[in-house]
Amino acid sequence: MASPDLMVQKLNDIERTYNDLTTRLGDPSLASNPQEMLRIVRMRAGLERTVEAYDHWQRLCAERNAVRQMIRDEQDPELRELAEEEHTGLEERIARLEDEITLLLLPRDPNDDKNVMLEIRAGTGGDEAAIFAGDLMRMYIRYAEGQGWSVKLASESPAEMGGFKEVILEIRGESVYSKLKFEAGVHRVQRVPVTETQGRVHTSTATVAIMPEVEEVDVEINPNDIEITTTRSGGAGGQNVNKVETAVHLVHKPSGIHIHCQEERSQLQNKARAMQILRVKLYDIKQREQHEQVSGLRRSQVGTGDRSEKIRTYNYKDNRVTDHRLSQNFTLNTAIEGEIETLIQSAIAAAQREQLAELARSSG
């Protein structure tokens, strides 16, 4: 393990912070400030796993020191051999734990614990691209439900032949962004479309964007930059459909962003939803601009969030999903049904390896 003294110093600092937060939670005056209490609870929870791992590491190191003393003092060859075997086992456990702690000490993305807006846009391929966008939407809904997250349709633009020209899902739950952020990019499908009469394989694409939730204070929006029109909602619904103007179309003039919302029951709710989506999109643009400035000299292979980055190909003929960032293949029929945890964990592991390599370069 590199720089053990530095690691211990960092862990001691984290432990002190954790203990301070624990003490603050016991302050009765905190009950009158629920927002501050929630902030402290979240901060403490974010440190808990690291503190527990550090405590375990200290106990194992103490055991190892005791066994080393036993090996030095023991006169009986058989007992010394048993102690040496125990020492070897402890060394292996400590090494594994140090690897785990190293990962825990890697800088965290400040957005990792946030909920997200997941946007899917049909790309090249016409009707088939829109149908594929619908397939991806179902894949993410099933994955989210399997994770225990909640999913709500925020905005949609259905296509005539099925699927969507564009669809936005609001996904809420524990550490949603930390997993879904690796899904951002271009997804490509190779298959025979339902509209194809001669059995030829077509290639189509859809683009996925993962945008973390933002508070109003995070993004300033000038009301004069917004143009809002209302229309009657279309599609299935109750008596209000096509009679009351509940649908909202919002245009943000400086960025050219268009948002159409009709999923909520009232015009006021749809306007609030459109503003929420606009804030998320503007924040995403700001974050990507900052990321490009910081990483202009060195492009990460995993998790750049670049909209133009081709990340996967879904080949139906061979029942194969290829992740181009990882150069790995996965089974398509299970992945498209929402079983993508293995794909996501592989991307997370690759990103962590990159972080470790970068850390080694910077400290070398």
Curated annotation (Swiss-Prot):
The modification N5-methylglutamine is found at residue 239. GO terms for molecular function: translation release factor activity, codon specific. GO terms for cellular component: cytoplasm. PROSITE patterns: RF_PROK_I. Keywords: Cytoplasm, Methylation, Protein biosynthesis. Methylated by PrmC. Methylation increases the termination efficiency of RF1. It is found in: Cytoplasm. Signal peptide: none annotated. Peptide chain release factor 1 directs the termination of translation in response to the peptide chain termination codons UAG and UAA. NCBIfam families: prfA, PRK00591.1. Belongs to the prokaryotic/mitochondrial release factor family. This is Peptide chain release factor 1. The lineage of its organism: Bacteria, Bacillati, Cyanobacteriota, Cyanophyceae, Gloeobacterales.
